[in-house]
């Protein structure tokens, strides 16, 4: 069986205009996949040079396949049909290691055509590393490497204002563009680089904050033989991902034209502020997950897909989204409903087995950040507690018993909550406390909730009533009136 290379698989090759820090599965099935579509359907005509930002020899270099690899995008499409689409990606030209090819790395700045910098160096990548110096070959941190590369470009083109870059980080931190820019400026000042360079950074370059959204399942280890048989070639960099994707970029409106988004419709939004989109994702996608998990798991289900194929549990989640979460969010309702529809479709993806117990990790913090804001906003707006979000809190407290149908299961959270719940449920079983007292103790934890939730009118009583129903009737019977 042939292995991918450009000699045996000839096709388009594009001039290098994009530098990408990070060789991982996510960028390859997200950014490079989108660039490949734009190259095919528009005159974007841009090739990617991947820079491996850390010192590692695994996985091998993409250059062993001349930058070629296959994405397999699968899930439910907009009509709810299961689809699986294999695509040979030609947007990546080569990969270089900043550690073994440092001079080659600096030479990227000399190419007048270079225009974009994308990155995904993990959440820890956009951080300050004390001791990084200008002359290090290379510096340790990604922001320091980028500062050095930007200075190389500034010097090579004598500070020309038309030679700046559009820098688009994809790391999962809030306002990642602002954070990266601040660190680049910090290194520039620490290294005593000329004031003219600092002015050029501001005038000629754009640091764009982003929100990225796609589940990338990566190399399909268990299915490789079958997939390669279907493809007819060997691919050591096969990359799988869900059908849904969303790329929100906070940047200049001109970016849409530069990326040729006006010529081919991708799910990319160029916006003035990513905040409402971040809130939408946290509230609807993450919030629905967090509400679903303790209810579905204690109803005897194990995966998100099983839960969405269960008529009652699915109805509970959809009503929570449409009746209790969406009404208190600050974006146009039709936009929110369209996003919610995509979310429930993603939950039904038959190609992804998303274990409920793995999503249950750190459930107490997830409830505080993902659901509590909507629960409180709903109470404030309507004067009544949103029934399903409140029930989800009772289900969460019940989940920390760590037992389903007489069998124990692992509960993963910080030590404080594990010990606290062990103690509280033990006291409940010994009849030292009742449900009302148990709930009040949990809701009074100011350090966790950042407020005393026992002061929210009716909350302790309603959560305790829901908890009683769960303990007495079982989850199925208790949740039914809310479905």
Swiss-Prot record:
Pathway: Carbohydrate metabolism; pentose and glucuronate interconversion. GO terms for molecular function: mannitol-1-phosphate 5-dehydrogenase activity; tagaturonate reductase activity. Coiled coil: none annotated. It comes from the Bacteria. InterPro entries: 6-PGluconate_DH-like_C_sf, 6PGD_dom2, Altronate_OxRdtase, Mannitol_DH_C, Mannitol_DH_N, NAD(P)-bd_dom_sf. GO terms for biological process: D-galacturonate catabolic process; mannitol catabolic process. It catalyses: D-altronate + NAD(+) = keto-D-tagaturonate + NADH + H(+). The keyword NAD applies. NAD(+) binds at residues 18-29. One of its GO terms (cellular component) is cytosol. It is an enzyme of class 1 (oxidoreductase). The keyword Oxidoreductase applies. Its EC number is 1.1.1.58. Keywords: NAD, Oxidoreductase. Belongs to the mannitol dehydrogenase family. UxaB subfamily. HAMAP family: Altron_oxidoreduct (MF_00670). This is Altronate oxidoreductase. It comes from Escherichia coli O1:K1 / APEC. The lineage of its organism: Bacteria, Pseudomonadati, Pseudomonadota, Gammaproteobacteria, Enterobacterales.
């Amino acid at each position: 069986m042939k292995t991918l290379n450009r000699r045996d698989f000839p096709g388009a090759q594009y001039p290098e205009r994009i530098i990408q820090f990070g060789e991982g599965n996510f960028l390859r099935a997200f950014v490079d996949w989108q660039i490949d579509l734009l190259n095919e359907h528009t005159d974007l005509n841009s090739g990617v040079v991947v820079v491996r930002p850390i010192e590692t020899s695994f996985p091998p270099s993409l250059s062993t396949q001349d930058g070629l690899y296959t994405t397999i995008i699968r899930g439910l499409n907009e009509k709810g049909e299961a689809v699986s689409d294999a695509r040979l990606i030609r947007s990546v030209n080569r990969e270089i290691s900043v550690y073994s090819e440092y001079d080659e790395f600096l030479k990227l700045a000399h190419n007048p055509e270079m225009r974009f910098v994308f990155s995904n160096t993990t959440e820890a990548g956009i951080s300050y590393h004390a001791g990084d110096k200008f002359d290090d070959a290379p510096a340790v941190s990604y922001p320091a490497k980028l500062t050095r590369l930007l200075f190389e470009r500034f010097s090579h083109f004598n500070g020309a204002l038309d030679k700046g870059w559009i820098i688009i980080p994809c790391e999962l931190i809030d306002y990642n563009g602002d954070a990266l820019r601040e660190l680049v400026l910090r290194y520039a000042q620490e290294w005593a680089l000329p004031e003219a360079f600092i002015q050029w950074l501001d005038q000629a370059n754009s640091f764009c904050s982003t929100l990225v959204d796609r589940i990338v399942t990566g190399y399909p280890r268990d299915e490789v033989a079958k997939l390669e048989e279907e493809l007819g070639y060997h691919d050591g960099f096969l990359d799988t991902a869900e059908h849904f994707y969303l790329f929100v970029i906070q940047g200049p409106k001109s970016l849409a034209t530069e990326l040729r988004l006006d010529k081919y419709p991708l799910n990319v939004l160029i916006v003035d502020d990513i905040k409402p989109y971040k809130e939408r994702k946290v509230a609807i996608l993450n919030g629905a997950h967090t509400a679903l998990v303790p209810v579905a798991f204690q109803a005897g289900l194990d995966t998100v897909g099983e839960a969405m194929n269960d008529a009652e549990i699915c109805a509970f989640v959809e009503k929570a989204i449409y009746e209790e979460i969406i009404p208190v969010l600050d974006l146009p309702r039709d936009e929110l409903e369209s996003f919610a529809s995509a979310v429930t479709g993603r939950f039904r993806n038959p190609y992804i087995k998303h274990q409920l117990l793995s999503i249950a990790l750190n459930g107490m913090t997830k409830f505080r950040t993902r659901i509590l804001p909507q629960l409180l906003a709903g109470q404030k707006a309507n004067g009544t507690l949103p029934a399903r979000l409140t029930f989800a809190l009772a289900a969460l407290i019940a989940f920390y018993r760590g037992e389903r149908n007489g069998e124990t299961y692992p509960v993963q959270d910080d030590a404080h909550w594990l010990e606290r719940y062990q103690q509280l449920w033990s006291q409940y079983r010994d009849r030292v406390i009742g449900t009302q007292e148990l709930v009040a103790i949990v809701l009074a934890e100011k350090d966790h909730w950042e407020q005393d939730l026992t002061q929210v009118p009716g909350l302790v009583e309603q959560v305790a009533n829901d908890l009683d129903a769960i303990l007495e009737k079982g989850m199925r019977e208790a949740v039914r009136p809310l479905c």
